[in-house]
Amino acid sequence: IQSITNISTDASNLERLNRWSSAFRLFEERPFFGWGPGTYQFVYAPYQLSMNQTIITTNHGDGGNAHSEYIGALADMGVIGSLIVILLVIVSVYKGLMTYKKAKNKESKILVLAATLAIISYFTHGVLNNFLDTDKLAVPVWSCLAIITVIDVYHSGKTNYFDPISEDQ
């Protein structure tokens, strides 16, 4: 707890604040479409203020991210991309809850509830950090969305999604 609340001497926390302020400066320069997905680590160094730099600051575009799914999206994709990310989160949680309600068996309910709670947990944590640019968390997050989708399709009652739509449907 002491480390989490220390924003005056903890290098990790100070670097997070440095990354956030750099991301906001990037956003101010390109507010609508941002700098491009995944470009933060390559463009943020010149947007750091010297007074915000820490012992773990890098100036070489050799890694790092904005330490927030939402602030990172703002810098990388601007307002448009950020709204899409927020919409993805809202729709995912809504779809998870509706699929839970619609599921007809206990196993499906447990699985979709676990996947939905995982999505909620990840994107809540995403306020302070981001890992979707790494395979370690991207795979589980997108897998949870796939689980919700598969269970939703399974309980929808439609038997074949690949049949062409006929005129009387």
Region annotations inferred by a language model:
Residues Q2, V91-N105, L132-D135, H155-F162:
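Juxtamembrane transmembrane-helix termini
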Residues I7-S21, F33-M77:
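Long extracytoplasmic/lumenal interhelical loops at the membrane interface
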Residues F27:
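Conserved short C-terminal alpha-helix that flanks the catalytic cleft of nucleotide-sugar-dependent
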Residues P46, K95-M98, G126:
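Transmembrane helix-loop junction
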Residues A66, L74-G78, D133-V141:
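Membrane-interface micro-motifs in multi-pass membrane enzymes
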Residues M77-S121:
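Hydrophobic transmembrane alpha-helices and their immediate junctions
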Residues L113-Q169:
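Transmembrane alpha-helices of multi-pass inner-membrane enzymes
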